[in-house]
């Protein structure tokens, strides 16, 4: 009987430890910032999310409420370096995503790294800093 209780108790401790450890191990080091509108696009807003887990890095940037730019390309820069361009959809949203596991270049992101989204002509739409 004692052995049975010991096994049951040990099993419960292991299950509890896994329940705590697994979500912690799976939780990525994630940082999200709000992107603020420029004077030229006061209704615009956006967000940028950087995730790092093990050797994988992922960066997502989205800008919204820019309907007057529908069908046009916007330029995404991180830390002053060109990340890429995206076309503004019919809803006035443009998004770019990069993931190192897909072989894509993901720039280094630290506290203070700036994110800027501009029109193809160079007019600032939104910006923010990690």
Per-region residue spans from a language model:
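Eukaryotic membrane transport/trafficking proteins
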Residues: 13-15
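N-terminal targeting/export leaders
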Residues: 3-9, 18-130
């Amino acid at each position: 009987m004692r052995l049975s209780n010991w096994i049951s108790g040990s099993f419960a401790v292991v299950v509890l430890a896994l329940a705590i450890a697994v979500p912690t191990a799976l939780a990525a080091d994630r940082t999200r910032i709000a992107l603020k509108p420029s004077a030229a696009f006061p209704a615009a807003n956006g967000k940028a999310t950087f995730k790092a887990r093990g050797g994988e890095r992922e960066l997502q940037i989205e800008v919204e409420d820019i309907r007057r730019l529908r069908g046009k390309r916007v330029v995404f820069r991180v830390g002053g370096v060109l990340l890429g361009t995206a076309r503004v959809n019919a809803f006035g949203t443009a998004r770019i995503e990069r993931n190192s596991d897909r072989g894509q270049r993901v720039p280094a992101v630290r506290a203070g790294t700036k994110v800027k989204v501009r029109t193809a002509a160079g007019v600032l739409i939104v910006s923010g800093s990690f």
